[in-house]
Amino acid sequence: MTGSEIRRRFLTFFAERGHTIVPSSGIIPKNDPTLMFANAGMNQFKDCFLGMEKRDYTRACSSQKCVRAGGKHNDLENVGRTARHHTFFEMLGNFSFGDYFKKEAIAFAWEFLTRDLKLDKNRLYVSVYTDDQEAADIWHQQEGVPLERIFRFGEKDNFWSMGDTGPCGPCSEIFYDQGEAAGCGSPDCTVGCDCDRYMEIWNNVFMQFDRSTDGVLTPLPKPSVDTGMGLERISAVMQGVTSNYDTDLIQGIIRHVERLSGKTYGKDERDDVSMRVIADHARAVTFLICDGALPSNEGRGYVLRRIMRRAARHAKMLGLADPMLCHMVDAVRDMMGAAYPELVEREEYIKKVILAEEQRFAETLDRGLAMLNDEVARMRAAGSTVIPGDVLFRLYDTYGFPIDLTADIVESEGFTIDEAGFEQCMERQREQAREHWKGSGAEGIGRVYKELYSRGIRGEFVGYDGLSALSPVLAIIRDGVEVESATAGETIELVTESTPFYGESGGQKGDCGSISTGNSHLEVSGASRPYSDLIVHHATVREGIIRKGDGADLRVSRPERSATARNHTATHLLQAALRRVLGEHVKQAGSLVSPDRLRFDFIHFTAMTTEEIRRVETLVNGFVMDNQPVVITQMDMASAIEAGATALFDEKYGDNVRVVRAGEVSMELCGGTHVRATGEIGLFKIITETGIAAGVRRIEAQTGGGALSFVRQMEDEQRALAGLLKAEGGNLPERLEKLLARQREMQREIESLQGKLNAAASGDLLSGVEEVGGIKLLAAEVRVEDVKALRDLSDTLKERIGQGVIVLGAAIGGKANLLVAVTRELSGTVKAGDLVKKLAPLVGGSGGGKPELAQAGGSRPENLAEALAAARQVLAEQ
């Protein structure tokens, strides 16, 4: 029975018994910061079990996509080495939310296994929690399981809880006896042994208690059921194999690895491990990227990168040099696409993400391996078998080797790693990043902010609804030190009880404007936010003296605030347009919003075409012309996400969030300032589109008056070009093309003439060929315009000299240039690179190259004759 058939039968079985089939949730959990990846079927029903969410069903079943790699559930290092560990797996589950309980759950499980799947009852064993007599009685009396096949285990194995407090309860597991051949051989081997003989296939969790902070268990009014059965494990049982990797779910992918590598699975255990690793990781990577994860250096993205790079390492061990993982997507799609159609829909996107990451790692993999091999040899010679932390860090920081990848590589050499030393290096780097202000005096400023905050000093932002406010001065800071007052000419930081100035955050620059007291006037150049509720004004005292405690009149510059608001709302519209034109994979990777421009970094894997840029620009300007209202509301985080608001994964949000909705176009969580309607943006113009990192593009744009100024500048430049080209009639491209065509024609004529001159010159030069040590040598100083002409001349001479060595010297642009060319027949005897390295110091320079052609440059052209003479001597001494 295939894995797909088992999945289908399971869901059908429970649907026929009143369960709603619920599609798998994404692997990336929505609005659950406690969870890196979905790792169990119950994840998407967590709020149902907690009583925080009511659904229109009380019975559910699902086949859930799961990943366990990183954090508490980390199977990565065992993947490929054991029969059952995976990073990606599917969990079949049935759930009851206050509906049925132990009696029905046990009956369902036993019926499905013994009647639908027809498993031999004599090979099935069960376990219950030590004190759960109720479950033991149901198994024995209701289902007829002999007492000798019912095992009791303690809290560690058979009691489940969601946390230190809250819903919890006993669980009951079902085991399948795979036979003595799969066991450890011990006469004491039984259920609970760590060997593979008695394999757990299904776990039934009975949530019947609420655990209080003091550990007291109170019965729940409506107990629930959460069960899980690994599809890979039950498939192994049904297909008569003892390894999940031998099931049809994974064998099809392994066969794809065989085709790519030319190796046969089952012939060599080391190759088999690598094939299993690649097959497993291909599934995990494909589903993770499909569900929205992207490779990065932190969080979920870093776990994904670790999985990909571990697969790349094992591909190299199989002799696969070119990007390989991207080709595995086809195999995963073939095996899983019917059950998960999103794989088919996003196939090309998944391949692009994987290829970009593989190419990035390929650039450093060989160099990193060479360094690691050298280090292993050095440590072995020193009598040590531990790779030091600083080496691990250098491999991570310079070559992109995750620490577990390094551990995996050196394990076969009998080495371990100094993980604690690595963490110390990482912490030093984090400390350096935290103190990047050090040396400028800014570290003192950082300390003073902490001191102010610890004293309870805060600054409330009141600038959403107005650009002015009256507030007392709470603190004045000069050169990182808190002072009582400041006088004209001094640059200071100022904290007030409330302020209309937006403190820089979320990519938006801080406001500028002015602050006045009865005795002073200050110009504010910006505002920052060292803490979410502490805003600091950066100001210069222009007149008078300002003191702590003074009443201040704070006024934000309206033109700059309005320009910033236009650019910020336009950024939201830009992201919406990019997603429409390029695809839903577009996600914000960074942004900058200031009065004069906006900058938006986003995930995309190829440069945008001119047509795509135009479509995005047209869409945004269409949104602007529609003059859609920009509505800002406060709501709880869960409601905002459910309503479809876009949020940044790594951003920290509170329980209540600010939602900015631009008509029906865009809805984002955002704390910035915005226009009241999209029409206020006026005009939107993309200035540049560039790449800033692998898979990250950047758009810079302007709006309103800034965009108009840019367009006018382009018009002025176009008019100036038209005047220079005498194309005032509007035919500038045609005129320019004619000019370029004429230039190309003249270049061809020049090259033709140069060829004739070279031929003539070579004839003259060849008369100077001499024989040195039985080898023809032509050493001459020539006059040429550039290095290309020097190379062209050497090519002509090589064709005419027969067999020989050519050494040319030329003064070009006040610099000495040497070129050595050796005909192919002599390149084994005389190497151009070696010869030029000996001559280059004579002209004050250095050089190198290949055996047949090498060049050098220097600062002393007056020594060219000496260098050419030395060529004769070097050749004679060979």
UniProtKB/Swiss-Prot annotation:
UniProt EC number:
6.1.1.7
State the free-text cofactor note.
Binds 1 zinc ion per subunit.
Compartments where found: Cytoplasm
Positions with a binding annotation for Zn(2+): H568, H572, C670, H674
Q: Which GO terms describe its molecular function?
A: alanine-tRNA ligase activity; aminoacyl-tRNA deacylase activity; ATP binding; tRNA binding; zinc ion binding
Catalytic reaction list: tRNA(Ala) + L-alanine + ATP = L-alanyl-tRNA(Ala) + AMP + diphosphate
A GO cellular component annotation in the UniProt record: cytosol
* Any Pfam family hit: tRNA-synt_2c
Question: Which metal ions or organic cofactors does this protein require, according to UniProt?
Answer: Zn(2+)
UniProt xrefs under CDD domains? AlaRS_core
The residues forming the signal peptide are none
User: What broad class describes the main subcellular location of this protein?
Assistant: cytoplasm
* Entry note about domains: Consists of three domains; the N-terminal catalytic domain, the editing domain and the C-terminal C-Ala domain. The editing domain removes incorrectly charged amino acids, while the C-Ala domain, along with tRNA(Ala), serves as a bridge to cooperatively bring together the editing and aminoacylation centers thus stimulating deacylation of misacylated tRNAs.
Q: Belongs to which family?
A: Belongs to the class-II aminoacyl-tRNA synthetase family.
Q: What is this protein called?
A: Alanine--tRNA ligase
Origin species, per record, is: Pelobacter propionicus (strain DSM 2379 / NBRC 103807 / OttBd1)
